[in-house]
């Protein structure tokens, strides 16, 4: 300390040391607060599982468009499972874990496996939803497991469908125009080119929100609906065949609001 002369005496050294530790304390405190804020922000995000894949659709593109579109209206952390290949029958290994949905607030089903008929496998999925895990179901999810003899998946969806009309641009008529999921949907919305699914049965637990009319026979079919399956809220739409539909802002907002609604986070 002999080199410390003049004004740079012991008191100055103490001030320097105190200043250093104050700055260090500030840095650590700030970093800690940032970590807390990030953790809280993470907790506010909806944890969503997207199950996709199977026959007849561009699922890689649709997944990307879905995630980007929903992000305009909802903060969501996604996990995408695309394990079933591109055929009509698959057993996704992800479901083998009895706690497969434990980490998620909602499951989005946009898959197409019409010829999977294994009842035990199907119930691995539906039992978890019936216990309370909400879901959003899109397009060919309604034809998934359609060859199965059991109705568990159909009751989960809220509708039974096994076929569809041709592709066209279908006008959408709101039947519950004040439902919060439909907020922002124009009264005159016409879909991009898509398929109209023929609804054979609307299950008693389901409520149609919007319908479209068949160009073949004029019959109306539900195209947007909600369902209560056990303890879980379900939102569904049969539209979603084309990439253009997934790019459509009205469709994107509807899916986002449906996802928020089933998770209890839709505030307006």
Regions found by a protein language model. Give the residues of each.
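N-terminal secretory signal peptides that target proteins for export/translocation
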Residues: 1-22
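Bacterial N-terminal signal peptides
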Residues: 22-34
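Sec/Tat signal peptide C-region and signal peptidase I cleavage site
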Residues: 35-39
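Helical hinge/lid and interdomain linker segments adjacent to catalytic or ligand-binding clefts
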Residues: 41, 47-51, 59-137, 141-143
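Extracellular ligand-binding/catalytic regions of CAZymes and related secreted enzymes
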Residues: 41-45, 72, 102, 216-221, ...
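Active-site rim elements
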Residues: 53-56, 167-169, 241-248
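Catalytic beta-strand/loop cores that center a nucleophilic Ser/Cys/Thr
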Residues: 71, 76-79, 103, 162, ...
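A glycine-rich, often tryptophan-bearing local segment used as a flexible ligand/cofactor-contacting loop or short
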Residues: 114-184
